[in-house]
Every structure is written in structure tokens, then in C-alpha cells.
Amino acid sequence: MNVLILGSGQLARMMSLASAPLNIDVIAYDVNSQQIVHPLTQQPIDLSLEQAIKQVDVITAEFEHIPHHILDICSVSGKFQPTPDAIKAGGDRRLEKKLLDNAHVANAKYHNINTKQDFLNAIDTVGIPMVLKSALGGYDGKGQWRLKDVSQVDSIWEEMDELIKSSPNQAIVAEQFIPFNREVSLIGARNKNGQMVTYPLTENVHVDGVLALSTALEGTSNLQQQADEMFTAIADELNYIGVLAIEFFDVDGTLLVNEIAPRVHNSGHWTQQGTDICQFEMHIRAVCNLPLTGNQLLRSTAMINILGEDSLPDEILTMPNCHIHWYGKEKRAGRKMGHINVCADSPEMLQKELSKLANILDKQAFKALS
């Protein structure tokens, strides 16, 4: 079987690595260069997008910001999974909010903003404090503002207005500020037959708006049930096929959906060592309509993002429960260069392993371990 992935970054890379044992060949479409490339080497392949579409059995995506005309070309083939509507909802907060409402899942109050009057109306609808997010293109904390007081309206509007005017169809979504206890996420999958599986919830720690540490949760049956039910509602609403990630706010034991990602997700990288079938293989299984299994937690596991670093002390390689995954990317400040998965026999032992790691790694570069 042959699969074409739209996007050629680290997620496509890891999906390709997970596909090989299944005897599934993967090629990728680099959205920037508009070339078909090998997902591991990035070497161009002498195929046009149209030729690649004809050659493969399945088309999928590694991220949601795919140009709509590319989605449309792939959709016409009947091979694209999940649906273009799912990808578009993941890339546009307005569509995402509408989806959550249609699926009847709990999320923060919101108001769409295109003009300053909309902004003022949002204050009445949503209230202060509020979080303001770009409808298109925002990620890792970018394109966001927090309104704490009416005195900030003019200065924040000036920045938002500039963003709205910077690209067609851009807007702002105002959301009620949610004072949450922690952020958690759920990775799940659904295939064409409607079979669904979910992984254990993950607790996430962000530093400067970027995911830094994810830990698989154990013994959270009530939260897990809430998350599973919301996953089912959203996946069914979309008639979803593939891996779907949902980020939640945990508010005193009640979950509210923050956002969705219609793809494999950074907070699910721990599944490479923590489960039998990682999220990357699970996505390939789902889009190829293969059985979904192996989602149970095998051992206590956490993932640490490597941000802006292209080397680590060799001492880490002496730790048998540590697994480094590099992405083969050029070093850049704050860039996701790779991740480390850490495993242990219990949550207590995992914390000891993370403490060992904290003593080895640079404390400024890995603040979440401090």
C-alpha cells in the first residue's frame, strides 16, 4: 500500500518510520517547495502532485494549514482521509468553535471579531478577562492576546486590526478566560468501519506558550470517561478517519475543550515508548482501514520537547529508559528539534528518571524539568 502525506515535517517523518513495518510506503508533499519528497531524506521525487495522487492508495495530512486548493485537488480523488472539512476546522478557530457547538461538547464562550465594534460586543458577550486568538495560522502561543482590563482595548485592537488586514479571511476569536487547574489532551483514532480507540489522557506543561513536557496520566477514570465521550462526539460529527487530538482545560475535574488538531500531535509522542502501537502507526492504520489496537499504557511515560538545541550530553545515552528522537532539522532558536521519551515502572520511578534527566540537561533550555 502507498500513502501520500501532505506536509513533510517531523510528523510525516515519524509516520513514515511507523509505516515501514506494515509494508506501507510513504511519500510526502512539501507545501512550501510544492515538491514530492522522501519524508526521511527530504530528497525530491520526480513526481508531480497530480501523478502522486494517482499513484497512491491513501492521502492524509501532517498538519492543518494546508492550502485549500491542495485539499480540494486531493479530495476529488476520493483518497483523502480525514475529510477536508476536518482539516479546515483544525485550521480555522471559527469553524472549530462551530464544530464543537454542533457536537454539543463543552467549550469556552466565544465571539467572532472582524471590527472594533465586534471587539466591544465581545466584551459584553464573553466578559473580561478574555483570550483573543487569530482565527487562522496561530500556533504555539502565537497570534494571541489577553485582555485583562478595558484600558487595554485600544492598544490590543491596533495589533489585532493589523493582523486582520494582513491576510484574506483573517479574523479574531474572543474566548472567555478559563481559570483551569491544568491542561490535558487526548489522542484517539477512528477508522472507516467506525472502530475507535483512545490513549490515556496526557498532562501537558507549556513554557512561553510552547509545549515542553507531556506525561501520560494514570488513575484518572472520571476524566478519561469525559474525554472519551467528547472524542466520540467530535469524531462522529466529522465522520472522522485517522488520529484526532483534543486539548482540554481541566477545571476542578470537569473538562472543557480548548482546541482540536485533526492529525497526530506533539502531546502524543510519548506513545512511541509507552504503548504497543504509537500514534503514528495508529494514524496509518486508521486511514488505511486496518485494525486499531495496542493503545493501552504499558509503562509510566513522559515526553520532553527539545527546543532550539541540536545536541545533548552523551550521558543521556547511558540511561536505559531514555529514548531520543531527532527530527533532522536545522537549528533555530525555539524550534522543535526533537524529543526525549522517558519510561519507568511506576509514576514515582518516572519522576526519579525525570530528576536525573534534569541534572544532566541545560536548565535554561529545559525549564519544564526544573
Swiss-Prot record:
It catalyses: 5-amino-1-(5-phospho-beta-D-ribosyl)imidazole + hydrogencarbonate + ATP = 5-carboxyamino-1-(5-phospho-D-ribosyl)imidazole + ADP + phosphate + 2 H(+). Its EC number is 6.3.4.18. Keywords: ATP-binding, Ligase, Nucleotide-binding, Purine biosynthesis. ATP binds at residues 93, 133, 138-144, 175-178, 183, 206, 258-259. Residues 97-288 form the ATP-grasp domain. Pathway: Purine metabolism; IMP biosynthesis via de novo pathway; 5-amino-1-(5-phospho-D-ribosyl)imidazole-4-carboxylate from 5-amino-1-(5-phospho-D-ribosyl)imidazole (N5-CAIR route): step 1/2. The keyword Signal does not apply. GO terms for biological process: 'de novo' IMP biosynthetic process. It holds the Pfam family PurK_C. The keyword Ion transport does not apply. GO terms for cellular component: cytosol. One of its GO terms (molecular function) is metal ion binding. Catalyzes the ATP-dependent conversion of 5-aminoimidazole ribonucleotide (AIR) and HCO(3)(-) to N5-carboxyaminoimidazole ribonucleotide (N5-CAIR). Belongs to the PurK/PurT family. Homodimer. This is N5-carboxyaminoimidazole ribonucleotide synthase. It comes from Aliivibrio fischeri (strain ATCC 700601 / ES114) (Vibrio fischeri). The gene is purK.
